[in-house]
C-alpha cells in the first residue's frame, strides 16, 4: 500500500478539495486515465485499480501511477464519546481535482488499454475518462 515514509506532522486538518489539478497531461506513457470528477482516492483504491490494470494487460507494457496518497485520515473508534483529542490515523488519501491524470500506460494496443482502464475505473469512486498522448 502507498503511504509516505516520513511526514513532518502525524495528523492534518480536514481542509477543502478545491482548485484546478496539476499533472493534466499524459507525460510518461501513451494512454492515460484522467479524472473528470473531484474526490479522494484511498491507498487501497489506488492499489486495487493498479492490480486490475496489471491483470488485464497480463503484465505486458508499463504502467505509471501518477497519484500518491499523502494525506492522513483519522477516525475515532466506535462508541467513543466526542472530545479527548483527534482520532488515530486509519488510512491515507490522495486529493483529486478534475483533469488530473491518475494512471498512464504504454507498450499495449489501444483496445487493450481501454479495456484495462475500464476495469480500473470500476474500482475508483470518481468519474474518469480515457485519454491519449497529444503530439504537438
Curated annotation (Swiss-Prot):
Which Gene Ontology CC terms are recorded?
cytosolic large ribosomal subunit
Which GO terms of type biological process are on file?
translation
Keywords in alphabetical order: Ribonucleoprotein, Ribosomal protein, RNA-binding, rRNA-binding, tRNA-binding
Pfam families, alphabetically? Ribosomal_L16
Q: Which InterPro entries did the record assign?
A: Ribosomal_uL16, Ribosomal_uL16_bact-type, Ribosomal_uL16_CS, Ribosomal_uL16_dom, Ribosomal_uL16_sf
Molecular function per GO? rRNA binding; structural constituent of ribosome; tRNA binding
Task: Report if keyword Ribonucleoprotein is assigned.
Answer: yes
Per its UniProt record, what Gene3D superfamilies does this chain match?
A: Ribosomal protein L10e/L16 (3.90.1170.10)
Subunit-structure text: Part of the 50S ribosomal subunit.
Similarity-based family:
Belongs to the universal ribosomal protein uL16 family.
- What does the record give as the function of this protein? Binds 23S rRNA and is also seen to make contacts with the A and possibly P site tRNAs.
Q: What is this protein called?
A: Large ribosomal subunit protein uL16
Lineage runs: Bacteria, Pseudomonadati, Pseudomonadota, Gammaproteobacteria, Enterobacterales
Amino acid at each position: 500500500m502507498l503511504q509516505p515514509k516520513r511526514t513532518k506532522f502525524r495528523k492534518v486538518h480536514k481542509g477543502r478539495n478545491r482548485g484546478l489539478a496539476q499533472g493534466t497531461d499524459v507525460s510518461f506513457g501513451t494512454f492515460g486515465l484522467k479524472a473528470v470528477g473531484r474526490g479522494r482516492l484511498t491507498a487501497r483504491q489506488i492499489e486495487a485499480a493498479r492490480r486490475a490494470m496489471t491483470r488485464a494487460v497480463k503484465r505486458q507494457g508499463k504502467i505509471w501511477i501518477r497519484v500518491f496518497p499523502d494525506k492522513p485520515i483519522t477516525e475515532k473508534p466506535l462508541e467513543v464519546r466526542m472530545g479527548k483529542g483527534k482520532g488515530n490515523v486509519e488510512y491515507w488519501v490522495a486529493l483529486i481535482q478534475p483533469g488530473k491524470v491518475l494512471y498512464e500506460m504504454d507498450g499495449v494496443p489501444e483496445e487493450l488499454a481501454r479495456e484495462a482502464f475500464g476495469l480500473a475505473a470500476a474500482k475508483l469512486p470518481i468519474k474518469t475518462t480515457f485519454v491519449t498522448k497529444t503530439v504537438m
